[in-house]
């Protein structure tokens, strides 16, 4: 049983209404000490006043009552709706603390929800992602995780691994019992291969989704005065970078963010690449190549009738494992468009960049965002990959002739990685599985 906590749920600012949340076994008792209205039935709202220690009215409020475990935190909870002034809201909060509540820590209500098994880590992360979503698309994707579909799939993988571990342990420790499945290489290997395939499919559909969800990184590169800064300004729809006819004005990397079709992009405008004697400008060129390394998409800007130089070739080489797009600026000066069919044509002067925007959008929409099995959390995806690698080790071991009692170490690692997505791995689960599924107590 936890102590009773309280906090302002709506932020400490002036607004029409503020909400103060209280959770814990003594929630009703503490609120009753300062509230003149009735204690309502579960999931009802009552009206009354909040009184201070001198029994003077602090505010008139509505109070929502949540009794028992069928609520967000899984314990008695109360929500007080008061007027949204900073002073009055904090007065109510201080009265709750003075009468026995403790000021909640950051995320403590959600932590209690998790500890009381009202949600798992997948949903907890989805809620946090929804709160911090920077785009409508991110918000929609986060909400898709609320139905628990991916949690149910991962739970089935966990159950399968748990069964295999428990059965292997039973074969080792209790070989005399013939009511337990006898796992050997021929029976264990197909089960391992099936799980590996499922995890591999999950990784494939999720890797790109994870990168896109968290924001694709774009680098704008090219010679001086080809329109790099103008393209940055056009994509941002604001004058973020200074545009002049003088070469070498961009010496440091300029970074900004923008959206296309609800997807987030972070973009870097880099120094123009040319032979220089100036140490400062040379440092800017070094930073350009560092930015290419860190980026997902490279926009290589060129102009009509310009010959390639060594820097252009270096850009292509360093962009080998990236999404590389050659952008032809000043398309209004192009006489023969057929010669540049492989390029994306834009005009930064006229802010005509629709072809480029459509191309960037197509990369994002190539993912099935409605697929409930998508994992976009880097943390969750890393756990899936660890499980996949551990099972691959187990598979190789079985194929090379190792017995189940040896590869069980890798199978257990795979299980622990998946359980860490749902919550903390607990070896008691293994014991529970062994003694609940098999007749070992006789």
Curated annotation (Swiss-Prot):
It comes from the Bacteria. NCBIfam families: mnmE_trmE_thdF, small_GTP. Exhibits a very high intrinsic GTPase hydrolysis rate. Involved in the addition of a carboxymethylaminomethyl (cmnm) group at the wobble position (U34) of certain tRNAs, forming tRNA-cmnm(5)s(2)U34. This is tRNA modification GTPase MnmE. HAMAP family: GTPase_MnmE. It comes from Mycoplasma mobile (strain ATCC 43663 / 163K / NCTC 11711). Binds 1 potassium ion per subunit. PANTHER family: TRNA MODIFICATION GTPASE GTPBP3 (PTHR42714), TRNA MODIFICATION GTPASE GTPBP3, MITOCHONDRIAL (PTHR42714:SF2). Signal peptide: none annotated. Residues 215-365 form the TrmE-type G domain. Homodimer. Heterotetramer of two MnmE and two MnmG subunits. One of its GO terms (molecular function) is GTP binding. Its EC number is 3.6.-.-. Keywords: Cytoplasm, GTP-binding, Hydrolase, Magnesium, Metal-binding, Nucleotide-binding, Potassium, tRNA processing. It is found in: Cytoplasm. InterPro entries: G_TrmE, GTP-bd, GTP-bd_TrmE_N, GTPase_MnmE, MnmE_dom2, MnmE_helical, P-loop_NTPase, Small_GTP-bd. Its main location: cytoplasm. GTP binds at residues 225-230, 244-250, 269-272.
């Amino acid at each position: 049983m936890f102590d009773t906590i309280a906090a302002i749920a709506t932020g400490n600012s002036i607004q029409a209404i503020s909400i103060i949340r209280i959770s814990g076994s003594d929630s009703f008792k503490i609120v009753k000490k300062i509230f003149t209205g009735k204690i309502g039935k579960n999931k009802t709202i009552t009206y009354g006043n909040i009184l201070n220690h001198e029994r003077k009215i602090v505010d008139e409020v509505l109070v929502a009552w949540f009794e028992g475990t069928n609520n967000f935190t899984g314990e008695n909870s109360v929500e007080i709706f008061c007027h949204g002034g900073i002073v009055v809201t904090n007065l109510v909060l201080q009265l709750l603390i003075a009468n026995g509540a403790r000021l909640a820590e950051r995320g403590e209500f959600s932590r209690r929800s998790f500890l009381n098994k009202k949600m798992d880590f997948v949903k907890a992360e989805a809620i946090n992602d929804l709160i911090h979503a920077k785009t409508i698309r991110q918000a929609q994707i986060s909400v898709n995780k609320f139905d628990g579909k991916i949690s149910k799939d991962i739970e089935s993988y966990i159950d399968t691994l748990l069964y295999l571990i428990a059965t292997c342990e039973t074969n080792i420790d209790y070989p005399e019992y013939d009511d337990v499945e006898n796992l050997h290489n021929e029976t264990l290997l197909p089960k391992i291969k099936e799980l590996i395939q499922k995890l591999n499919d999950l990784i494939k559909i999720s890797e790109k989704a994870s990168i896109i969800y968290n924001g694709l990184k774009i680098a704008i590169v090219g010679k001086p005065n080809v329109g790099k800064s103008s393209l940055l300004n056009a994509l941002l729809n604001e004058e973020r970078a200074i545009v002049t006819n003088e070469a070498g004005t961009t010496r440091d990397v300029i970074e900004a963010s923008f959206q296309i079709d609800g997807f987030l992009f972070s973009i870097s405008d880099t120094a123009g690449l040319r032979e220089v004697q100036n140490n400062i400008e040379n440092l800017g060129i070094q930073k350009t190549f560092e930015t290419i390394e860190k980026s997902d998409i490279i926009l290589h800007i060129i102009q009509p009738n310009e010959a390639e130089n060594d820097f252009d070739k270096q850009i292509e080489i360093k962009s080998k494992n990236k999404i590389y797009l050659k952008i032809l600026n000043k398309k209004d000066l192009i006489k023969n468009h057929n010669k540049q069919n492989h390029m994306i044509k834009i005009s930064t002067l006229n802010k005509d960049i629709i072809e480029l925007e459509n191309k960037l959008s197509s990369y994002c929409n190539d993912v099935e965002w409605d697929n409930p099995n998508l994992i976009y959390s880097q943390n969750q995806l890393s756990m899936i990959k660890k499980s996949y690698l551990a099972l691959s080790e187990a598979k190789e071991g079985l194929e090379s002739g190792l017995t189940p009692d040896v590869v069980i170490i890798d199978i257990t690692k795979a299980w622990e990685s998946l359980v860490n997505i749902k919550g903390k791995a607990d070896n008691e689960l293994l014991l529970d599985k062994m003694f609940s599924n098999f007749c070992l107590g006789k």
